[in-house]
């Protein structure tokens, strides 16, 4: 039976590096499951692999325009196409990235929640813009107490939960429990890389400085020139809001760096908790060496 290998973990945990090593040793193809690395206009700030520096096949990187609101369902369709093509070539698909919604769609399947009316989607967004995160979160909790499990700063999930309760009258979490879902693939192996937090935090800080020292400012300038609405997914990539604040003379570059580093560290911290809670049966590895040893035994 063909295996599907999934390598995930917090941002800056070394997923990309170890995936390349695994692909080299096992005739693999790396397939992206990072929801921001899909966008072709922002390769630097999303730390996309430099495909001209490796002979390992990489799929689903930098192939969607930032002007598009690309859905999880669309990604799943693209993923399945790449997986089956990889099987046809007798290669090992290595799904790599840290986007929780993408990983969940593989492990638990896509939600069968009804499509939201455009009018409800628009009204929800307008309400969110008027109230702001905290007041909108409080209103959501009144309508859907089960939404307390959401983080008040995760605007995407707050909007989604509100849209669903408005559309269906039922909590998104209740619907997820009641509507039958199944994994995309029965033969997946889920490995989660969880290095020491301080090691990851240092990499986050260093990586952002490296981006600033490259041409990331110019990259964000070009993104701004596209006049993309702020709520579009690409505009929320880590570091972009802070650099935009700098470019609009609201904060200094030093402050932009400080805030972006802090926000990304906080995101990584939440990822540690989220992965452990969502995927308790996954294989967790603190070091790349531990993971490589497992892979070498599994596929020898």
Curated annotation (Swiss-Prot):
Transmembrane segments: none
Binding site for ATP: 9-16
Pfam annotation, one family: IPPT
GO molecular function: ATP binding; tRNA dimethylallyltransferase activity
Interaction with substrate tRNA as annotated region, ranges: 34-37
Catalytic reactions of this protein: adenosine(37) in tRNA + dimethylallyl diphosphate = N(6)-dimethylallyladenosine(37) in tRNA + diphosphate
Cofactors (names): Mg(2+)
InterPro entries: Dimethylallyltransferase (IPR039657), IPT (IPR018022), P-loop_NTPase (IPR027417)
Binding site for substrate: 11-16
Keywords: ATP-binding, Magnesium, Nucleotide-binding, Transferase, tRNA processing
The organism's place on the tree of life at top rank: Bacteria
Record carries keyword Ion transport: no
EC number: 2.5.1.75
Single Gene Ontology BP annotation: tRNA modification
Site (Interaction with substrate tRNA): 99, 121
Record function comment: Catalyzes the transfer of a dimethylallyl group onto the adenine at position 37 in tRNAs that read codons beginning with uridine, leading to the formation of N6-(dimethylallyl)adenosine (i(6)A).
Self-association state and partner proteins as the record states: Monomer.
Similarity annotation: Belongs to the IPP transferase family.
NCBIfam families reported in the protein's UniProt record: miaA (TIGR00174)
HAMAP family for the chain: IPP_trans
UniProt name for this protein: tRNA dimethylallyltransferase
Originating gene: miaA
């Amino acid at each position: 039976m063909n295996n599907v290998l999934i390598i995930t973990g917090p941002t800056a945990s070394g997923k990309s590096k170890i995936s390349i090593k695994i692909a080299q040793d096992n005739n693999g193809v790396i397939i992206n499951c990072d929801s921001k690395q899909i966008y072709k206009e922002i390769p630097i700030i999303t730390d996309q692999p430099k495909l001209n520096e490796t002979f390992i096949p990489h799929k689903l990187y930098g192939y969607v325009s930032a002007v598009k609101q690309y859905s999880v369902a669309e990604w799943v369709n693209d993923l399945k196409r790449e997986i089956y093509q990889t099987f046809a070539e007798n290669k090992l698909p290595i799904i790599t990235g840290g986007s929780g919604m993408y990983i969940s769609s593989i492990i638990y399947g896509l939600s069968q929640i009804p499509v939201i009316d455009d009018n409800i989607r628009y009204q929800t967004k307008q309400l969110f813009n008027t109230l702001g995160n905290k007041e909108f979160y409080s209103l959501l909790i009144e309508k859907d107490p089960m939404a307390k499990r959401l983080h008040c700063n995760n605007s995407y999930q707050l909007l989604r939960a509100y849209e669903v309760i408005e559309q269906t009258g039922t909590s998104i979490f209740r619907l997820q429990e009641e509507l039958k879902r199944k994994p995309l693939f029965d033969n997946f192996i889920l490995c989660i890389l969880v290095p020491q937090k301080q090691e990851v935090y240092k990499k986050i800080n260093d990586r952002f400085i490296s981006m600033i020292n490259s041409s990331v400012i110019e990259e964000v300038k070009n993104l701004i020139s596209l006049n993309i609405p702020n709520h579009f997914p690409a505009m929320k990539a880590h570091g972009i809001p802070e650099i935009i604040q700098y470019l609009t003379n609201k904060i200094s570059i030093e402050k932009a760096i400080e805030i972006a580093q802090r926000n990304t560290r906080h995101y990584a911290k939440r990822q540690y908790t989220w992965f452990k809670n969502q995927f308790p049966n996954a294989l967790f590895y603190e070091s790349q060496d531990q993971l490589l040893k497992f892979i070498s035994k599994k596929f020898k």
